[in-house]
C-alpha cells in the first residue's frame, strides 16, 4: 500500500486550523486510545476534559463553566440550537442568525426541524433592526458571531443578548475561530460582556490544539440538561454530547496547549497574526487591489478569479468569500516570510 504523507502547511493560507502546538501533539499521542464519551471507564481523560472546559471558561469570561469538548464548531452550534429548541415553549420554534453566520446553522435547522431566519448585515455585522424584525413569540434563539468566517467581524453581542432576553429567547455566540484572539481586543463578545447562554469556541483553531477539539460552553449545567439522555449500559448514567464515542486525543491536546499558552502565549500569537494581517493588507492594497480592513487577522482582497486560480496552481491554498474576494487567514503557521513568498508569486502572475 502506498504511504500517504500529510499535507504541509507551508502554502496553506485559508484554513482556520493550524499545525498543533508541540504540547498538543504530545498529549494527543498519549491519549489516542481513550474515549471521554465513557467517563466512568476513562477517568483520566474525563478529568482532563473538566480542566479544558474550566480553561475555556477562563478564556471566555465564564467562571465555573459548563460544557464539553466537541468534534468542532459545527457540532457545538447544532447543540446550541438543540438546547434552545428543547427549552422553548412553542411547537414551531425559530432562531435568528445574521447572514454571516456559519453554514453549520443551516445544518442545525435541517436536522432539528427549526426554522432559520437570516438577518441582513451592515458593514459585515448583524443589522440590529433587521434582527428585531425577525424576532417573534416563537423565537427560541438569537445568534451572534464573534469573528465571522469570511471577514473576522464581531457582531454587537450585548445588543443581541438584550434583544434575546426581551423575547424570552436564549442567546448563542459563535466564537469558534475568534475566541482565542478576542480576549486581547476591546470587543465586547463573551459571557462577562453580555448575558449570553451558550458559546462555540474551538481549541483546534487559534488555540493550536489537535483536531478534533471544538468546544461548547454553557452558562449553567441546567442548559446542558436539555441535551441529556439515559445511557444504561455505560458506567455513567446520562450523556449530553451529540456523539457517543469522542476523541480523548482532542481533549488531552486542548487541555495541554491551553495550559501551555494561556494567557501570554496566545496574546503574543494574536499580536503577531494581527500585525501580519495589517502588513499584508497594506501590501496588497499598494498593488492596486481592494482590501477589506482586517479587524481581526483575516484579509479579504479583490483578486481576479483567474489570478487566484493561477496562485492555486502554484500550490497556494486560497479560498473565496461569497462576494468572490480571495481570503487569507493569518493563522499561527502563516509567517511573514510565507506571506512575502506569496506576494512574490502574486507579482509574477498579476
Swiss-Prot record:
One of its GO terms (biological process) is coenzyme A biosynthetic process. Pathway: Cofactor biosynthesis; coenzyme A biosynthesis. Its EC number is 4.1.1.11. Catalyzes the decarboxylation of L-aspartate to produce beta-alanine. One of its GO terms (molecular function) is aspartate 1-decarboxylase activity. The lineage of its organism: Archaea, Methanobacteriati, Methanobacteriota, Stenosarchaea group, Halobacteria. It comes from the Archaea. Its cofactor is pyridoxal 5'-phosphate. The modification N6-(pyridoxal phosphate)lysine is found at residue 205. InterPro entries: GrpII_AminoAcid_Decarb, MfnA, PyrdxlP-dep_de-COase, PyrdxlP-dep_Trfase, PyrdxlP-dep_Trfase_major, PyrdxlP-dep_Trfase_small. Transmembrane segments: none annotated. It catalyses: L-aspartate + H(+) = beta-alanine + CO2. Keywords: Decarboxylase, Lyase, Pyridoxal phosphate. It comes from Natronomonas pharaonis (strain ATCC 35678 / DSM 2160 / CIP 103997 / JCM 8858 / NBRC 14720 / NCIMB 2260 / Gabara) (Halobacterium pharaonis). This is Probable L-aspartate decarboxylase. Belongs to the group II decarboxylase family. MfnA subfamily.
Amino acid at each position: 500500500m502506498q504511504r500517504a504523507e500529510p499535507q504541509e502547511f507551508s502554502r496553506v493560507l485559508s484554513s482556520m486550523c493550524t499545525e498543533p502546538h508541540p504540547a498538543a501533539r504530545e498529549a494527543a499521542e498519549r491519549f489516542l486510545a481513550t474515549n471521554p464519551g465513557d467517563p466512568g471507564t476513562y477517568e483520566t481523560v474525563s478529568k482532563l476534559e473538566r480542566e479544558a472546559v474550566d480553561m475555556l471558561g477562563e478564556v471566555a469570561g465564564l467562571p465555573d463553566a459548563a460544557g464539553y469538548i466537541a468534534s468542532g464548531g459545527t457540532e457545538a452550534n447544532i447543540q446550541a440550537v438543540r438546547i434552545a429548541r428543547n427549552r422553548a415553549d412553542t411547537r414551531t420554534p425559530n432562531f435568528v442568525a445574521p447572514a454571516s453566520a456559519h453554514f453549520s446553522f443551516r445544518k442545525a435547522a435541517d436536522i432539528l426541524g427549526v426554522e432559520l431566519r437570516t438577518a441582513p448585515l451592515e458593514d459585515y455585522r448583524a443589522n440590529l433592526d433587521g434582527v428585531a424584525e425577525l424576532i417573534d413569540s416563537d423565537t427560541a434563539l438569537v445568534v451572534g458571531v464573534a469573528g465571522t468566517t469570511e471577514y473576522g467581524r464581531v457582531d454587537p453581542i450585548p445588543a443581541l443578548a438584550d434583544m434575546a432576553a426581551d423575547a424570552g429567547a436564549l442567546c448563542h455566540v459563535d466564537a469558534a475561530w475568534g475566541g482565542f484572539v478576542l480576549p486581547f481586543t476591546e470587543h465586547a463578545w463573551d459571557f462577562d460582556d453580555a448575558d449570553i447562554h451558550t458559546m462555540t469556541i474551538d481549541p483546534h483553531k487559534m488555540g493550536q490544539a489537535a483536531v478534533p477539539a471544538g468546544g461548547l460552553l454553557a452558562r449553567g449545567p441546567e442548559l446542558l440538561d436539555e441535551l441529556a439522555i439515559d445511557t444504561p449500559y455505560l458506567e455513567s448514567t446520562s450523556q449530553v454530547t451529540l456523539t457517543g464515542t469522542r476523541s480523548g486525543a482532542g481533549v488531552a491536546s486542548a487541555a495541554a496547549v491551553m495550559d501551555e499558552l494561556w494567557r501570554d502565549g496566545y496574546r503574543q500569537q494574536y499580536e503577531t497574526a494581527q500585525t501580519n494581517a495589517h502588513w499584508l493588507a497594506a501590501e496588497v492594497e499598494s498593488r492596486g487591489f481592494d482590501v477589506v480592513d482586517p479587524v481581526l487577522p483575516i484579509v479579504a482582497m479583490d483578486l481576479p478569479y483567474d489570478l487566484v486560480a493561477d496562485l492555486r496552481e502554484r500550490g497556494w491554498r486560497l479560498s473565496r468569500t461569497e462576494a468572490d474576494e480571495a481570503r487569507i487567514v493569518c493563522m499561527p503557521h502563516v509567517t511573514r516570510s510565507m506571506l512575502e513568498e506569496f506576494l512574490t508569486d502574486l507579482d509574477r502572475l498579476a
